[in-house]
């Protein structure tokens, strides 16, 4: 499909493709000249592959060419083999792939990002995979934070109010979340309208969801849930000055690599930003040619 110049009357959250449910695919689409997001998805086992997205987020900011958010139970979603380039974005800018507010589990492989604010944004979630991507003129290439673990009252209350109910009461329409609906969930769960992440088929297909139960054992009125971020990032190619921008929980000041605590050395901090202070790498003048040699191996 060729999709362009949409959302003329209502600019926000009217993407070219909007997928809600399970097992849908957005494949071989050319989407451009949109005021906001190109592709949005909510659910499980979604695939966004082989698309070219450019000149989107032209009249808005804090948005992504591809967007999903706010649910730990979204699993099996893959974004791969997409060419995402030359985005707009005002204020907070435009992201290539925007994983918002602790959504988790997105697999992002073999994408090419060029000329945008952040290539991949992971907003406090867990179980991400970022492999074999190329980042050109994105600063930073990858942004990752621990908003799910911060003690700040805005995020800690949000964890209890939004994320905890979506773990125990998986709704038929995951982005519908009125106050009335939330208050009625417990009754509907017993009537079979809702399922829990600990029930089949969720826990059977995604056994990693069981780990979240430990974090959600607090009572409903508590506001101190802590869910640290986690991601596998490997074999990517970084051209930008800043490869990673990472914001951690100020109460721990700890970095981990593959489950082991690591010291914040100068070499490591070349790829990490601590609370907004960029530590930038030197760009080789030879990088004017952005083609890769046939035997090029990405950063481990």
What are these regions (language model features)?
Residues 151, 155-224, 243, 251, ...:
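Long intrinsically disordered, low-complexity regions that are acidic and Ser/Thr-rich
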Residues 1-7, 20-36, 44-58, 74-88, ...:
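Right-handed parallel beta-helix
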Residues 1-39, 100, 171-176, 182-195, ...:
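Long hydrophobic alpha-helices with heptad-repeat/coiled-coil character
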Residues 10-20, 37-43, 61-71, 90-102, ...:
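Glycine-rich beta-solenoid repeat tracts in large extracellular/virion proteins
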Residues 14, 36-38, 75, 80, ...:
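Aromatic-enriched hydrophobic runs in primary sequence
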Residues 4, 13, 54, 67, ...:
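Sequence-level detector for tyrosine residue identity
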């Amino acid at each position: 499909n060729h999709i362009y110049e949409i959302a003329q009357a209502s600019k926000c959250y009217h993407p070219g493709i909007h997928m809600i449910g399970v097992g849908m695919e957005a494949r071989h689409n050319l989407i451009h000249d949109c005021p906001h997001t190109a592709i949005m998805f909510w659910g499980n086992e979604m695939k966004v592959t082989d698309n070219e997205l450019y000149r989107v987020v032209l009249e808005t900011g804090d948005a992504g060419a591809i967007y999903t958010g706010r649910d730990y139970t979204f699993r099996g979603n893959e974004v791969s083999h997409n060419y995402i380039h030359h985005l707009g974005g005002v204020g907070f800018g435009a992201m290539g792939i925007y994983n918002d507010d602790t959504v988790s589990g997105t697999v992002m492989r073999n994408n090419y990002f060029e000329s945008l604010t952040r290539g991949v944004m992971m907003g406090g979630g867990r179980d991400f995979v970022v492999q074999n991507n190329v980042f050109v003129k994105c600063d930073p290439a990858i942004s990752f934070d621990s908003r799910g673990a911060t003690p700040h009252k805005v995020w800690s209350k949000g964890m209890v109010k939004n994320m905890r109910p979506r773990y125990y009461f998986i709704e038929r329409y995951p982005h519908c979340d009125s106050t009335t609906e939330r208050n009625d969930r417990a009754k509907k769960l017993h009537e079979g309208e809702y399922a829990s992440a600990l029930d089949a088929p969720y826990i059977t297909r995604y056994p990693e969801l069981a780990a979240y139960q430990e974090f959600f054992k607090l009572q409903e009125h508590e506001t101190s849930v802590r869910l640290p971020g986690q991601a596998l990032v490997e074999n990517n190619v970084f051209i930008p000055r800043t490869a990673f921008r990472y914001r951690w929980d100020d109460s721990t000041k700890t970095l981990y690599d593959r489950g082991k605590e690591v010291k914040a050395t100068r070499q490591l901090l070349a790829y990490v930003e601590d609370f907004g202070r960029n530590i930038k790498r030197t760009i080789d003048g030879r990088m004017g040619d952005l083609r890769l040699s046939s035997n090029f191996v990405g950063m481990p």
